[in-house]
Amino acid sequence: MDTQESPSTLVIDQTTILSLLAALSLLVTAYITSLYLLHSSATTKLRVIFIWHLFDALIHFVLEGSFLYNCFFTFTAIPHSTDYPHPASLTSPAVHFLGYADRLYGSQYGTSLTAKLWQEYAKADRRWGGADLTVISLELLTVFGAGPLALWICELVRRGDKAGRLWFWASVLATGELYGGEFNRRLSIDRTGLS
């Protein structure tokens, strides 16, 4: 009986390292910003709340915003073929993203650093490589809803809100993040059959 373990398939490449460094730099940016914007007498709890929500906003704007940018502005022309719909299309046959039947949109067709980041992510879930309408609709909500709300929470911390608005909006945002993540997870299970 052979008990030899198979070699690991974990690959740490340049894209992975740059992606992790990008996320770490956003966290460091949030921390340094807290040092400048919060009074030195701010409690540790409020400083952590500020850092967390600023980090959340930066993730929404920088990383998820780059996903939306790639979905709307990065594309490849579909060669004329008899394959209909095109095998790489993430939309129904009669649905053409942005009205172009001859284009496929998404990071899968880009060469920028952010496109490479999303190409890596798409290896685990192909919806993130193209223009999946459900993912785009969720990301529009996070970039234009959750991101600004996270900044508003940071502003309430900075002002020293005593009226309870801080905790109300922090609870609203946390609930939205939890439900959004769960919805996306369930949708992925429904489409792939994997849990």
Stretches with model-predicted labels:
Residues T175-S195:
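Juxtamembrane loop segments immediately following a transmembrane helix
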Residues E155-L178, E182:
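Glycine/proline-rich loop-helix segments at beta-alpha junctions forming the active-site rim
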Residues A23-H39, I59-C71, L149-L156, G180-L187:
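Membrane-embedded alpha-helices of multi-pass membrane proteins, especially ion channels
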Residues D2, A42-V48, L68-A122, T192-L194:
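Interhelical loop segments of eukaryotic multi-pass membrane proteins
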Residues M1-T15, L90, A94, L117-I136, ...:
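Juxtamembrane membrane-interface segments at transmembrane-helix boundaries in membrane proteins
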Residues M1-A42:
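Sequence termini and other peripheral, non-core segments
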Residues R127-D161:
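Internal catalytic-core helix/loop-beta-alpha segment
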Residues L10-L24, T44-L63, V135-L140, G164-L173, ...:
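Transmembrane alpha-helices of multi-pass eukaryotic membrane proteins
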